[in-house]
Amino acid sequence: MPEYDLIIRDGMVIDGTRMPRFRADIGIKNGRIAKIGRLRAGDAAKSVDASGQIVAPGFVDLHTHYDAQLFWDPYCSISSWHGVTSIVIGNCGFGFAPVRP
């Protein structure tokens, strides 16, 4: 049985720690990163070739104006196109959207 569900192979990893980028494989198990490093070919049920690609964690956009946009674009599509996986809303001192306390 494979050790990982998925291996992202040979990507250029930028991990957000200010460490220089590095080439590595990423082993995913149960939806979580289990290992970063050089992994054996048969260690996963599936693999994705990330050669020539940058692999990074999801970005957090700390300044958005999505308070109202959530009503007509519930997926905040433009953010996900750029690797953003989390957003902060209402941080400008006001919000457009009605909310419950």
Give the residues covered by each predicted segment.
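Di-metal (Zn2+ and/or Mg2+/Mn2+) metal-binding site signature of metallo-dependent hydrolases
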Residues: V55-I78
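Activation segment
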Residues: T17, G37, A68-L70, V88
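Acidic/polar N-terminal loop/beta-strand segments that form early-domain functional surfaces
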Residues: G16, K29, H65, I89-G90
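Histidine-rich, glycine-flanked metal-binding segment
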Residues: M1-G58
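Divalent-metal coordination cores built from histidine and acidic residues
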Residues: W72-P101
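Flexible loop/turn segments at secondary-structure boundaries
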Residues: D15, D67, F94-P98
